[in-house]
């Protein structure tokens, strides 16, 4: 038992040493900067999806209330209400262009940190650029699917009851799924986050890193990001003096700190995987 605890402690110290030595907190700060630039174009696209399907904005914000800090939701809600009256194709195109530019830049920052951790030779610039653009489009698809999952509710299951063949409707437990959906959709959102993290980890890791190791580190990172977001939301909700310290900038500071935490956890998952693979080789 003592030997196992020593091994865990040594593993943790090795991860901490690698994390600080590689300057991952600096990379997380750069990543959070690009995430801020990505957020508002993403909200433009979300606004377009809401208007396209005539969905309820308040339902989206209420569904995310348990996952995101209140300050982050405040910024998102204010911005979405601001752009809600505009469904301009030019505005959407500008948002998509900015999204691809900022998201691909953030991904390249993440890949550079992963190259340093794994001691990879940096690939051709155009190849890395193309990969980051493709992953940015995948990120946009994930956002779209997340919006669909959030807005899927009782109306959707009622629609299935009306249009599915009777035999199929009897086989599928629609009533049970309808009651459990308020929790199942959070599980689906976690799966979307996990899938995106796994794809990024796999794309940035060298080929000698096994899929099993990528899966375990991705699970750790995705779970940590979700858990940290919930805890951070609870902590901010309990802190009544936060707005007194930062005034009108409180929501923006909460957003920046939350994105910085998420960036650190994403890179921490890479550091854990690197130490794991290095120990496996010994």
Walk through the language-model features, giving the residues of each.
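Membrane-embedded alpha-helices and immediately adjacent juxtamembrane helical segments
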Residues: 1-282
